Amino acid sequence: MQVMPPTPGGGPSRLFILRPVATTLFMIAILLAGIIGYRALPVSALPEVDYPTIQVVTLYPGASPDVVTSSITAPLERQFGQMSGLKQMASQSSGGASVITLQFQLTLPLDVAEQEVQAAINAATNLLPSDLPYPPIYNKVNPADPPILTLAVTATAIPMTQVEDMVETRIAQKISQVTGVGLVTLSGGQRPAVRVKLNAPAVAALGLDSETIRTAISNANVNSAKGSLDGPTRSVTLSANDQMKSAEEYRDLIIAYQNGAPIRLQDVATIEQGAENNKLAAWANTQSAIVLNIQRQPGVNVIATADSIREMLPELIKSLPKSVDVKVLTDRTSTIRASVNDVQFELLLAIALVVMVIYLFLRNAAATIIPSIAVPLSLVGTFAAMYFLGFSINNLTLMALTIATGFVVDDAIVVIENISRYIEKGEKPLDAALKGAGEIGFTIISLTFSLIAVLIPLLFMEDIVGRLFREFAVTLAVAILISAVVSLTLTPMMCARMLSYESLRKQNRLSRASEKFFDWVIAHYAVALKKVLNHPWLTLSVAFSTLVLTVILYLLIPKGFFPLQDNGLIQGTLEAPQSVSFSNMAERQQQVAAIILKDPAVESLTSFVGVDGTNATLNNGRLQINLKPLSERDDRIPQIITRLQESVSGVPGIKLYLQPVQDLTIDTQLSRTQYQFTLQATSLEELSTWVPKLVNELQQKAPFQDVTSDWQDQGLVAFVNVDRDSASRLGITMAAIDNALYNAFGQRLISTIYTQSNQYRVVLEHDVQATPGLAAFNDIRLTGIDGKGVPLSSIATIEERFGPLSINHLNQFPSATVSFNLAQGYSLGEAVAAVTLAEKEIQLPADITTRFQGSTLAFQAALGSTLWLIIAAIVAMYIVLGVLYESFIHPITILSTLPTAGVGALLALMLTGNELDVIAIIGIILLIGIVKKNAIMMIDFALAAERDQGMTPYDAIYQACLLRFRPILMTTLAALFGALPLMLSTGVGAELRQPLGVCMVGGLIVSQVLTLFTTPVIYLLFDKLARNTRGKNRHRDEDIDSSELLNGQEPQ
């Protein structure tokens, strides 16, 4: 089987060698295009891999979780469930709020999803409660995605209700208009309102009820059209004093007459300017504040969005009074920028190390400059392709370019080394360039396309992992392709004009010492190689052992999804007993905040309590902890989290759950801990039985810590058991009872005050401080059929029960989410296996289905495709090599080098305590492409020696190994030193980059040592096998010819 001979006279390089001006201008064009592309590229932490996600929030103050579920969530879910492209629908119905999160397929544009959601909301409108104060509101945002910016607004001389009003109208609305902003939430809930607190005994004494008062207030405050008068000469618009806008006006409102005397609202109630919801509060550190959390839309440029907000912020702050202070407490872009800057530094360091390696081997300044120019040209030129493909400058693309520094010089090194060999033999530089480039051209093409073939399977991966791989793979492939073009055009042209026999023979002390060292190494390698070739079966057993060891290590190594990053930001959830009151929860929250702020690694924090669209239950408080920069603290996030939890453990009755904020957010729900899986059943009763059992079982298992669930069914419920017969006899309907209860205890929004810039509400409630607890029910009065007051206690009894604080659905069925963190020293793979085992041990019924969520689900998908991905890469490379060599055998020889790389990578990961995760898998895929280069360079020269010089296979492969030892060692060290900065990185985001560097360095070291010996032995083995096969075929053909002659036939 013959390899295609090199094109005589320079091959594809001939035109570029003979036309230096055109070649130079061509390279300048590539460089300029890359510079322009670089300046236009956006910057982000990772490639945009967000699922199109929309959150629908519906507020219904005073409604229980049961009422919210049945009257709001269920009708909306039925409509949403009919949308095409919907991947998952999760809902959480709590007291006063319904939150539905819709996650769509990656291929569905977000704008199309938005249109479908709006249509579904419109279709469900007639099924929603008629007294719903606000329609369902949707936002193009993932609720689990942490805010890109957090602003804290505090004031000393102005009430927080006024501060909230100014922030909402002057800041929040303007920020919402910025391109890329998905949602601006105001935590703290101090929206201005007129609060009417009824004095229940006074209302009863005057023979009134709350419904009469509610109706009077609603009728007294209206803002409707009144028409206009159109006379002969002029037109007059009608207006009236039909609105009441302040608490003072409401105090004098006449709500009824008794014995001809007016009863004013202030006679039966306390009226004050207050907050619309007085069970919401937020703090910046320990100071009361309005906290603005700004979240991005899925798929937008974080840096550009944050920069736009920061540019407009000074002007917005100027519109506020001087006593109002606005601070940026969290800016996620600071760590993104720091991480990208660190990778850029590592890229420059990798370039410097690679150039140093080239100089040590070539020992000549001119010869070093030529391949060194290939690095900036290839890398900068790649930016142009990245721009046209819609990529960004992020950790993965910069990692690809860093790794590419070791790749892109390989081709140039091979070319210059071959040309230098002919110049040193005495040939003219131009002839040497034409001859050397023509001879090596096919090898360059083989190296390039076989390496790109490794990356092809990455392009066809689906889901989140596929999106992550794709940008990395394409960036690397483009850099490799440009480097091949440079090596076949610019490199030989420069060799013809910059190299000479004298310059190559000119040596200094360093070059002479390195020359002696390399000669010594090659001499010893030659001796060792002869011994190995004379004992092939021992070498083959070593090669087979590496294959077996690779499989064993793959099975044993801990497996994860994505490295845990230290971005300097921690999300926390504080959990208190399910029956805790708002004031008690706020007090506990402040206790915890004070403890956390004492930690030396903590810079600031924001926290809030209360039920809104982001927090489901009153017994949960949310915290966002900002850490000091890495340079100002000694510990990483895992140690800080452990320390904070230990510090807070002394506060009675609370549990603190913490998790580090990550750049990659796949989850759709904001959970207490990092990993989640759900249990889904047909009824809440089944979940109430099995969720606690499973949580208890997991708490006993080693891989887990902070195991918890969102199943909370021990909230106190005051059940009003109405005697329907008695109520009917008195002419009291259930609607009247519900209205009376809602008026008393629901912070009912009964009227709207319209102004030029905003709308405010009138809130009705009983003054429960006068009669706290269940005794407040004794003050409820209803009006019977005879017009007389009827105490609620005469027709109903109050029973204390337990009930759910929230009701969760997944794809319209009741569900509960169990969440956990990993214990120190355990991997996500071990945790997944432990969950499966726990389900079997507690004998979970078949009608309760479990499913991992978020990053755990993505981990399972990635784990399932990893092996097939590696196999696909090997098959793709075999096909390309088979086509290039027109051989079935030689590609197998080349691919036999791969197990050595796998052993080195897996051993390096285990020794450094890293998991086999997505980033490490990228490293292994790249090793498959790099390591086979050694075999290609050996086999190309061996085949050429057999064909052109008539050498035996033994002599040919022996000479090829010695002749190619120097370029093999040079290219391997270039790739190794290119990966070294990633392995040794310590800055922001280093956790993301280290596994790739560790894989590359470990794999290259082991494979370099082994493939120099195993490849020639396997080459001879397959050559012998091929010759034996050809011999048998020849004997068979001769036998056929003989039989034809005996039968009197001419041979065919």
From Swiss-Prot:
GO CC terms: plasma membrane
Pfam families: ACR_tran
Bilayer topology: Multi-pass membrane protein
SUPFAM superfamilies (alphabetical): Multidrug efflux transporter AcrB pore domain, PN1, PN2, PC1 and PC2 subdomains, Multidrug efflux transporter AcrB TolC docking domain, DN and DC subdomains, Multidrug efflux transporter AcrB transmembrane domain
Alphabetical keyword list: Cell inner membrane, Cell membrane, Membrane, Transmembrane, Transmembrane helix, Transport
Disulfide bridge positions per record: none
Subcellular location: Cell inner membrane
TM helices/strands, residue ranges: 16-36, 342-362, 373-393, 396-416, 440-460, 472-492, 537-557, 863-883, 888-908, 911-931, 968-988, 1002-1022
Entry's Gene Ontology molecular function annotations: xenobiotic transmembrane transporter activity
Family assignment from sequence similarity: Belongs to the resistance-nodulation-cell division (RND) (TC 2.A.6) family. MdtB subfamily.
Protein name: Multidrug resistance protein MdtB
Biological source species: Yersinia pestis (strain D182038)
